[in-house]
């Protein structure tokens, strides 16, 4: 029988550059496999408030 999806969790990514500039932060949600990716995710995503691609880090 197939195993369940207990290894995948939903995480929230928050813009780091908007915080430094004092502008509204953008947030994205995604999933990650907690067995394969134990450290926090860092992805480049589009921030509509800054109108450019910025670094988004995983928050709790």
UniProtKB/Swiss-Prot annotation:
Keyword Ribonucleoprotein: yes
InterPro entries membership: Ribosomal_bL33, Ribosomal_bL33_sf, Ribosomal_zn-bd
A Pfam cross-reference name: Ribosomal_L33
Gene Ontology molecular function, alphabetical: structural constituent of ribosome
GO CC term (a single one): ribosome
Keyword terms, alphabetized: Ribonucleoprotein, Ribosomal protein
Keyword Ribonucleoprotein: yes
Example GO BP: translation
HAMAP family noted in UniProt: Ribosomal_bL33
PANTHER family noted in UniProt: 50S RIBOSOMAL PROTEIN L33, CHLOROPLASTIC, LARGE RIBOSOMAL SUBUNIT PROTEIN BL33C
Sequence similarity: Belongs to the bacterial ribosomal protein bL33 family.
Protein name as annotated: Large ribosomal subunit protein bL33
Annotated source species: Chlorobaculum parvum (strain DSM 263 / NCIMB 8327)
